[in-house]
Each structure stands twice: as structure tokens, then as C-alpha cells.
Amino acid sequence: VTAARDAVIAGRLEQVGPALRALSVTPPTTDTPVDWLPWLQEVQSTAGNGAVPQTLEAAAASVAALANACGDCHRATRSGQGGAAQGAERYTAEDRSGLAEKMARHQFSAEALWLGLTIPEHQAWSAGAEALLNIRVPGLVDVHGKPLVADRRPSGTGDLQGVRDPRLPAEAHAATEPQADVADLDAALRELRALGGRADQARTTGEKQRVFAELITRCGDCHAAVGLDLT
């Protein structure tokens, strides 16, 4: 399952299908409890349905649906990764700044939201949402990349739904071609911050599935566009 997820995040569409196909035909082990078999069949069916993705977006949707199916199984059978997420900690930037901090934050968010779906565990999901909704964007950091405002905690109440983030300054626009990449990055970071707000507000597994699919699609699109090799 994680192989398909990581392929989407890396922007490697050609690697997603084989990973999903392999999962769809993997037989259960001899010690698999009988009451797990219907759920295993559901997981394999979900993997098989997404085994021939035509776009990265479709691949991400299949991976997110698979994560949701895993979570349903773990919830019903009380299995899965046990208390793996019980000790989920909040994201901390430590001494990182700039691109290194952003990538560490994105990686933390993707992993925490994944655990929130697959275990499933609200604490992990909330930690991932909080990291995303506090992404540092131009105008909210000083010249050294340090935050100018305190992080927002997850609301858990729906207070932010449909409301523009009041802390975001006016969006930067590229006046000349050399500034285009800067403006594009600004816009991408704002979109991810808004996605964190949606993750914070997600209350159903379907909503969480859609948010996660959108997140890893954005990750994969960006990594593919800049030619970053994560393998």
C-alpha cells in the first residue's frame, strides 16, 4: 500500500499501477483470521480497480480510497497498527527554515494524515492537519524564514470552514518573468495551507479521503515538475 502512495508522492505514475496490481492479487497468509477475509477482499478489489491509472490525480484517488478501505477494516476488526498513532506528536520546525522546513512539514503532514486514515486515528489526522494549516508563506515569515505569527491549533469545531485565513497577507503577483516561480510557489503554499484548513474541518472518512488524495496529487505534481527524484 505504501509503495503506491510513495509513487504518487514522487510523481511516478508508472510505478503506481504495478504496486496496486501486486496488492490486488496477493493471497492471504495461512494465519489470516477468517473474519478478516471479507475486508481483505474489499481492499484487494479497491486496489484492483485503481491498478490502471491514467493520470496522477486518478492514481491519488485510488490510493486514498485504498487507505480508507484499510481504515474501515482496521476499525471493524480492531486490528491494524494498534497504538502506533497514540503518541502522535505535533509538528515542530526545530532549527529548519526555508525549503528544508517546508519539505519536512509536508512529509510530516502526509505521513500523519495517512495514519489518520489507515489506522484510523483522529490524533494523527489532527496533527497532520495542524502542520498543513500553519505552512509558512511569504508575508508570514521574516527575512530569515522564521514565523511572524503563532501557529493556529486545530479548531475541531468547524469555525474556519469557508472563512478566509485572516492571517494571510495580500497575495504576491509576478510582475516580470523572473518572478514567476516565486509567485507560483507563493500560490502553491497558500493552496496547501488552505488544504490544511479543509483537513482540519474534515469530519467523515469520505472528506478525509478526498483531502488526502488532493494533497498527494499536489506533492506528486510538484515533484514531477521540478524533476525531483525521491526514489
Locate the predicted segments by residue.
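Sequence context surrounding c-type heme c attachment/ligation sites in exported
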Residues: 1-231
